Design a protein with these regions (language model features):
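Bacterial Sec-dependent N-terminal signal peptides
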Residues: 1-22
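Non-catalytic accessory regions flanking glycosidase/transglycosidase catalytic cores in CAZymes
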Residues: 21-195, 212-242, 267, 271-272, ...
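Conserved radical SAM core fold
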Residues: 51, 80-83, 135, 199-205, ...
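A short small-residue
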Residues: 144-162, 201-202, 278-286, 333-340
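Short, conserved phosphate-binding/catalytic loop or strand-edge motifs used
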Residues: 194-200, 323
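Noncatalytic carbohydrate-binding groove/subsite architecture in carbohydrate-active enzymes
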Residues: 211-371, 380, 384, 425-429
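Active-site rim elements
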Residues: 343-347, 389-397
Length: 559
C-alpha cells in the first residue's frame, strides 16, 4: 500500500512538474534601471568584402541600416588583399597596393572606395580593418591566393596574405596613404567617427608572425593612422577566444605592450589604444541526431575578455568591441558539410541571439567595463543555393528569421530595466554551464525610454528538439502612464520565418518570381495579433502570452 501511494505521489509530482514547467512568469520593473541599452548589437561583419556592392549585398545593407536607429558599424576582412576583386567564399581583394618593376608603391583605392561608398551612402560606419598583407609586401608571398571549399580543412586558406611585411616602413606608408585618402574623400568629421583596427585573430594562423611582430606592426600602423588623422580611433588586437590560453595570453601581452612597453616607432612607452577587441564563439555539436548549442563557451570568452581588460587600470573606461560574437566559427561552412550548423536557417539562431545578447550586457555590468559593440559575423553569400545553411542574415535576398531579432533590438532604447523570471537562467549559470537543464531558459530583456518601453522575451534551450509551447505570465510594474498602446511581434515557425514558408513550398531550388515575393514578405518581422490600447492600473499591467520553444517575442509599449 505504501509503495502504491509513493508511486502515485511520484506520478502526480511528474505531472505537476510537466504542467508547471510550461507556466513561466516574467516580472519587469520599469522603475529599476540597471544600465544603458548601448546598441552593442548594431555591428556586423563578414569575410568577403566584394559582396558589399553586389545586388543582394546592397539590399541587405540597406535593410540593416533601416532597422537601426543609430549608425551601424560594419567590419570586413581582406580590405588590403591583392587580387582583381572577384568574390569567393572566405576571400576578397581590392588590389589597393602593388609595386612597379623598381619596387615603387602603386596605390589604387577604386575597390576600397566602392566598398566604403556603399556603407556611407546608407549612413553606416566602417570598422575599418587594416589587413591583410598585399602580395608585394608579404615576407612569404607564395602561394598567395587560396580557394576555399566548404568541408575542406581550414589550413588551406592561410597563405601569403597572412605574413608580416618585408618592409615595415612601406606598410606604414600604405596605411598612412589609405587614411589620408579616406579623409580627402569622406571628410575629417566622417572619418573621425570610424574605428581603425589591425588584422584579425593574430593569435591564430591568420597571422604568420609572432606576438612581438604583431605588436611591432601595430605600432607602425597606429603611428601611420595618427599621422594622417591625429583624432582617428585605432585599436585591436581581435584575438580568438580569451578564455583559451593562446588567445588570453596574446591579449594580455598586447595590452601590456600598449600600456607599459617601448613603442617600436616612437621609442616612448606605450601605444595608442582607443578600443580593445577580441572574439567569442560558441561550440554547437550533434548529439543523438540533433544540434546541441553551447552558449556557455561563447560567454566564457566574453567574461574572460572583460576580466582581462578590467585588470589593466589604465583601460578601465576603454571601449570594448567583441569583433566576432557568434554561435560558432565558420560562416562559410554550410550545414550539408558541417551538420552541427543546421541551427542557422530556423528559429534556434534567433532565440540563441536574443538570449546571448542579454547575457553580454549582464557580463559587462558584472565586470564594470565599457561594452561598446558585438559584431555578428554574418552577412550574405551571393549566388549560393537557397537556405544552404551558411551563417548569414539573408539567402538570395530573402531575410532569414535571425535578422528579425535585430529588427526587435532596433525598437529597444534608453535604459535597461530589471527583469526577473522563474525560468530565466542567471547569467553566470549560462556562462558556466550553458542551458542544459530539463527546463528551457524563458527570459527577457527590457528597456524604458521617453514615452516608450519594450520587452524582448525568448524560450530557448541548447538542444534543438521539439518542446511544448510555454505560457508566459508577464507582469509589467511601475509603468509611468495611465494608458498605453501595446504591440506584440513574434519570431516562430508561423511568424517572421521565410525558411518554414520555403519548406512548405517544397524547398524549391529555383523559386518562381511569385514565390520569391512570398518569401520576401515572410522574411519581415511580423506582428502577433492586433495592437491594443490598455488602461494601466496602479502602474501595472498583467497579461499572458504563449511562446513556442525557440520562439522570440517583443512587446512594445507607447504612451
Amino acid at each position: 500500500m505504501k509503495n502504491i501511494s509513493f508511486a502515485r505521489i511520484v506520478i502526480l509530482w511528474f505531472c505537476s512538474m510537466a504542467g508547471w514547467a510550461q507556466k513561466a512568469t516574467l516580472t519587469v520593473d520599469f522603475s529599476k534601471e540597471i544600465g544603458s541599452m548601448q546598441p552593442a548589437w548594431a555591428w556586423f561583419g563578414y569575410d568577403e568584402p566584394n559582396y558589399t556592392y553586389m545586388k543582394d549585398g546592397k539590399k541587405l545593407l540597406s535593410e540593416i541600416a533601416a532597422l537601426s536607429p543609430v549608425p551601424v558599424y560594419v567590419r570586413a576582412h581582406n580590405l588590403l588583399t591583392t587580387g582583381d576583386g572577384t568574390p569567393a567564399l572566405k576571400w576578397g581583394s581590392t588590389n589597393a597596393y602593388t609595386e612597379d618593376a623598381q619596387g615603387n608603391p602603386i596605390y589604387d583605392w577604386t575597390i576600397v572606395d566602392k566598398i566604403f561608398d556603399t556603407y556611407i551612402e546608407r549612413g553606416m560606419k566602417p570598422l575599418a580593418q587594416i589587413g591583410f598583407m598585399p602580395e608585394a609586401l608579404s615576407s612569404k608571398p607564395e602561394p598567395y591566393r587560396h580557394h576555399f571549399v566548404p568541408g575542406q580543412s581550414y589550413t588551406t586558406i592561410f597563405t601569403g596574405w597572412t605574413y608580416p611585411p618585408k618592409d615595415y616602413k612601406k606598410w606604414a606608408e600604405l596605411v598612412y596613404q589609405w587614411v589620408k585618402h579616406s579623409v580627402a574623400r569622406y571628410g575629417q568629421k566622417e572619418v573621425e567617427s570610424w574605428y581603425w583596427e589591425l588584422w584579425n585573430e593574430p593569435d591564430s594562423p591568420y597571422w604568420g608572425g609572432t606576438v612581438q611582430e604583431y605588436c611591432k606592426l601595430y605600432d607602425y600602423s597606429a603611428d601611420a593612422v595618427r599621422r594622417a588623422l591625429p583624432t582617428a580611433k585605432i585599436g585591436g588586437p581581435h584575438v580568438t577566444g580569451p578564455a583559451g590560453r593562446r588567445g588570453g595570453n596574446f591579449l594580455k601581452t598586447f595590452l601590456k605592450h600598449c600600456t607599459q612597453d617601448t613603442n617600436y616607432v616612437t621609442g616612448k612607452i606605450g601605444a595608442p589604444l582607443d578600443f580593445v577587441a577580441f572574439h567569442a564563439k560558441g561550440a554547437p555539436k550533434l548529439v543523438n541526431g540533433h544540434v546541441q548549442m553551447n552558449m556557455g563557451t561563447q560567454l566564457r570568452d566574453i567574461s574572460t575578455g572583460f576580466e582581462i581588460v578590467a585588470s589593466f587600470p589604465q583601460l578601465k573606461n576603454t571601449p570594448i568591441i567583441i569583433g566576432e560574437s557568434d554561435p560558432e566559427g565558420c560562416a562559410a561552412c554550410g550545414m550539408k558539410t558541417d551538420p552541427q550548423n543546421a541551427y542557422r536557417n530556423g528559429t534556434m539562431y534567433s532565440s540563441y541571439t536574443a538570449a546571448s545578447f542579454a547575457r553580454k550586457y549582464a557580463l559587462a555590468d558584472l565586470h564594470q567595463v565599457n561594452f561598446k559593440g558585438a559584431v555578428s559575423w554574418s552577412f550574405e553569400f551571393e549566388d549560393q543555393p537557397w537556405f544552404y545553411g551558411f551563417r548569414d542574415l539573408a539567402t538570395n535576398g530573402v531575410d532569414k528569421p535571425v535578422l528579425n531579432v535585430f529588427r526587435m533590438f532596433g525598437m529597444m532604447s534608453g535604459k535597461r530595466v530589471d527583469v526577473k523570471g522563474n525560468f530565466m537562467y542567471p547569467a553566470l549559470t549560462v556562462r558556466d554551464s550553458s542551458v542544459r537543464r530539463s527546463t528551457p531558459d524563458i527570459g527577457g530583456l527590457a528597456t524604458k525610454d521617453e514615452g516608450t518601453a519594450a520587452v524582448m522575451l525568448w524560450n530557448y534551450h541548447d538542444d534543438d528538439v521539439a518542446g511544448t509551447a510555454a505560457t508566459v505570465d508577464l507582469t509589467l510594474k511601475n509603468i509611468p502612464a495611465q494608458k498605453v498602446n501595446i504591440t506584440q511581434y513574434r519570431i516562430d515557425n508561423e511568424h517572421s520565418n521565410s525558411y518554414e514558408v520555403w519548406k512548405k513550398m517544397g524547398s524549391p531550388t529555383n523559386p518562381t518570381a511569385e514565390q520569391i515575393t512570398e518569401l520576401e514578405k515572410a522574411g519581415q518581422l511580423a506582428r502577433y495579433g492586433e495592437s491594443k490600447r490598455q488602461t494601466v492600473k496602479d502602474g501595472q499591467l498583467i497579461f499572458s502570452t504563449t511562446l513556442p520553444r525557440q520562439g522570440v517575442g517583443l512587446v512594445t509599449l507607447e504612451w
